[in-house]
Amino acid sequence: MKIKSLFVCVFLLCFNHVFSQIKEHLVHEDYERLWLTYLPKHYSENKSYPLVIALHGGGGTAKQLMNNTRKRFNKLADKEGFIVVYPQGIKKSWNDNNTRDTNGFARKENIDDVGFIKKMINQLTSKYAINTDAIFACGVSNGGLMSQTLAMELPNKIKVIGMVASNFGLDEINKIKEVSPFSILFIHGDADPIFPYNKGEIRVFKKTRGPVLGIEKSIAYMCRLNGNSGEPTINAIKNSSIKDNCTSEHLVYPNLKNPSLKVELIKVKNGGHTWPGAKEQRLIKKLVGKTTQDFSACDKLWAFFKSTMN
């Protein structure tokens, strides 16, 4: 009898684990669009949950982002009580509506990724108990640019984003009159060999992928948009991992008129084109640079998102 009870318990634990991570899909413009949904432990229809949309980089997948970040968002979802989804780009790319180049399949074919994400959000909010005032987007590289595009083109749905190893394309300079304010956290390594920290060209395998503003001008754009002014407060992040040869600091740009509109930067000194706290990809380290282990970008992103809910 004890063995039978133990079997039932193990089965239920496995079932709950499978249920918490769900493969979902919809059809948009004749493409089947896919994503992974992770529901927190003890999910209840009687509660209301924030939604975090996590977007992989160019050449990546939804599953890779989840696994390479050590499933940290999932663990935070269990602890903090939010839903996280990992959408999949067509042929591993996102159409971030930036004219810098047409090398990515999604940009080349003008895939309607904004329409897909909008439809995905609508499907999720009709299916799960989601707080529609707390929908956040974040991503790395091409996924970071896609997050920016979502904030600019879906202002009624997404008002807070995070960009990892990415900053604004040169096009954005001319968009400021068309864009509604939104809060943003940049996380960027100043030794990123692919997506330049300073103004320059994105380069992949020595081929240019178009110009970007760089962090300084991207922040200036956001401060102008949101009304942030003055010198930032700067706090060092504990250097808990000496071996990574990186240090980091957190810059917060003040907004006295509207503190709810936030502009922040975590600068990773000597950091590369990587997601802080992620598994280090040794085979491509020379291509992407160093990965700091002093903190998890997932933790910092969620803390930032959560701060905008207060």
Question: Predicted regions span which residues?
Answer:
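Alpha/beta-hydrolase active-site loop
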Residues: A106-Y128, T149
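Conserved alpha/beta-hydrolase
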Residues: E80-K92
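Sec-dependent N-terminal signal peptides
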Residues: K4-C14
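Active-site glycine-rich loops that stabilize anionic/oxyanionic intermediates
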Residues: Y49, G57-T61, G271-G272
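A domain-start/cap signature at the N-terminus of enzymes
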Residues: V18-L51, Q64, T69, L76-E80, ...
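Short beta-strand/loop motif that positions the catalytic acidic residue
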Residues: F186-H188
